[in-house]
């Protein structure tokens, strides 16, 4: 039973809109508020809703420390401290992303409150369509996620829980054998403390030693779980297709060509990618080439 409540109002830097709850069933929209349960390891239920130009966070937990941790993780996940104004100012007249930057300057990458959640979900998303990946994630949450005291919310599975799973158990959630092995190995490394996801580069190096974990998984972890706007998941099929079209290649681009295409946007390659994909999906194919750093600055 919750004995501590922490409530605070935050004013996001620049234009802001709530992200969608997603399709894994962890973050819920209820009565105008985004709600989820977070463990540290104590359980906290945290809610977020708009109030007079700000966002109010309210966390209830057994201890004040757990409630504070939950609000900190929720503000990261919702991008409430994510200041993209320098990026917008620098590239607002870019021929590719300038128009959508001026129309929708609130777009931010989807984030996860815990880096392990981003890592686990990136592994489930390898080489499959998004709908199937979401179904796998929902199955993992139902089977291994930690339930809230009220019984209506579930957190994503903890690394300690997945570390104890057998390959066949994860395969029963429709995860391919190789992905199941990778998820178990990664979970064991994190649970044992051999991989510290708060230490970005050292963690990436150790994760890359695990079979079936490659650059795309690391870049997805970095962007969605570690707040790295410079880490574009360049191997994503959407980027391979988009760059192939924009660069006039007549084929899908290679990963190296995607990285080269987005190099002028450094250190905001991932932000540029988010906006470029939105421009492509919302208004049809975008046209042009990136501005040089000098011209866009």
Where are these regions (language model features)?
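HhH-family (HhH-GPD) DNA N-glycosylase catalytic core used in base-excision repair
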Residues: 1-297
């Amino acid at each position: 039973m919750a004995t501590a409540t922490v409530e605070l109002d935050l004013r996001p830097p620049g234009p802001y809109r709530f992200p969608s709850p997603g399709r894994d069933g962890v973050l819920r929209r209820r009565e105008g508020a985004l709600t989820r349960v977070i463990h540290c390891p104590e359980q906290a239920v945290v809610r977020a809703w708009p109030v007079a130009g700000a966002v109010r966070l309210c966390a209830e937990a057994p201890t004040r420390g757990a409630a504070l941790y939950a609000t900190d993780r929720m503000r990261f996940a919702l991008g409430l401290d994510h200041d993209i104004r320098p990026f917008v100012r620098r590239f607002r007249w870019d021929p590719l992303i300038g128009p959508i930057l001026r129309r929708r300057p609130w777009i931010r990458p989807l984030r996860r409150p815990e880096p392990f959640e981003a890592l686990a979900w990136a592994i489930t998303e390898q080489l499959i369509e998004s709908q199937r990946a979401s179904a796998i994630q929902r199955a993992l949450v139902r089977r291994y996620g930690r339930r809230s005291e009220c019984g209506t919310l579930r957190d994503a599975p903890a690394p300690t829980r997945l570390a104890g799973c057998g390959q066949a158990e994860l395969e029963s959630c429709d995860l391919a054998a190789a992905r199941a092995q990778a998820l178990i190995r990664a979970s064991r490394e994190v649970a044992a403390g051999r991989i510290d996801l708060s230490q970005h580069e050292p963690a990436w190096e150790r994760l890359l030693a695990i079979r079936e974990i490659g650059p795309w998984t690391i870049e997805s972890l970095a962007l969605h779980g570690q707040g790295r706007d410079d880490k574009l998941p360049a191997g994503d099929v959407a980027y391979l297709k988009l760059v192939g079209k924009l660069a006039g290649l007549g084929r899908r681009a290679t990963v190296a060509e995607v990285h080269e295409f987005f190099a002028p946007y450094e250190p905001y390659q991932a932000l540029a990618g988010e906006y470029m994909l939105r421009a492509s999906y919302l208004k049809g194919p975008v046209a042009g080439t990136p501005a040089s750093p000098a011209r866009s600055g």
